[in-house]
Amino acid sequence: MTMVYANIFLAFITSLMGLLMYRSHLMSSLLCLEGMMLSLFVMMTVTILNNHFTLANMAPIVLLVFAACEAALGLSLLVMVSNTYGTDYVQNLNLLQC
């Protein structure tokens, strides 16, 4: 594994650890998800360019489209939750609590 792949994989793992550890605010969770999507995009692009996969050239663009949709839905959820509860704590989203 080259250093480029190792650094991209480390960025993904760091974002995943941030998502698992700092999940008190919805905004920090969304930022960690965006970091994960960005590292997946870079990993996919570098892999396609290095291996000359001509049929998979559109895959990173499709991933970016899904990441943009995920970001838009996440931000709309953030606005709705902050308007309803006045804060963006993830504990407010737990529906199993009484």
UniProtKB/Swiss-Prot annotation:
Entry's Gene Ontology cellular component terms: mitochondrial inner membrane; respiratory chain complex I
Q: Which UniProt keywords apply?
A: Electron transport, Membrane, Mitochondrion, Mitochondrion inner membrane, NAD, Respiratory chain, Translocase, Transmembrane, Transmembrane helix, Transport, Ubiquinone
Q: How does this chain sit within the bilayer?
A: Multi-pass membrane protein
Its subcellular locations are:
Mitochondrion inner membrane
Q: Is this entry keyworded Mitochondrion?
A: yes
State a single Gene Ontology molecular function: NADH dehydrogenase (ubiquinone) activity
EC numbers, comma separated: 7.1.1.2
The first-level EC class reads: translocase
A GO biological process this protein is involved in? ATP synthesis coupled electron transport
**One Pfam family name from the record?**
Oxidored_q2
Membrane-spanning residues where?
1-21, 29-49, 61-81
Q: Which Gene3D superfamilies match?
A: 1.10.287.3510
Catalytic reactions on record: a ubiquinone + NADH + 5 H(+)(in) = a ubiquinol + NAD(+) + 4 H(+)(out)
Broad class of the protein's primary localization = mitochondrion
User: In which family does this protein belong, per the annotation?
Assistant: Belongs to the complex I subunit 4L family.
What does the UniProt record say this protein does?
Core subunit of the mitochondrial membrane respiratory chain NADH dehydrogenase (Complex I) which catalyzes electron transfer from NADH through the respiratory chain, using ubiquinone as an electron acceptor. Part of the enzyme membrane arm which is embedded in the lipid bilayer and involved in proton translocation.
Task: Fill in the subunit field for this protein.
Answer: Core subunit of respiratory chain NADH dehydrogenase (Complex I) which is composed of 45 different subunits.
Protein name (Swiss-Prot/TrEMBL): NADH-ubiquinone oxidoreductase chain 4L
Q: Tell me the lineage of the source organism.
A: Eukaryota, Metazoa, Chordata, Craniata, Vertebrata
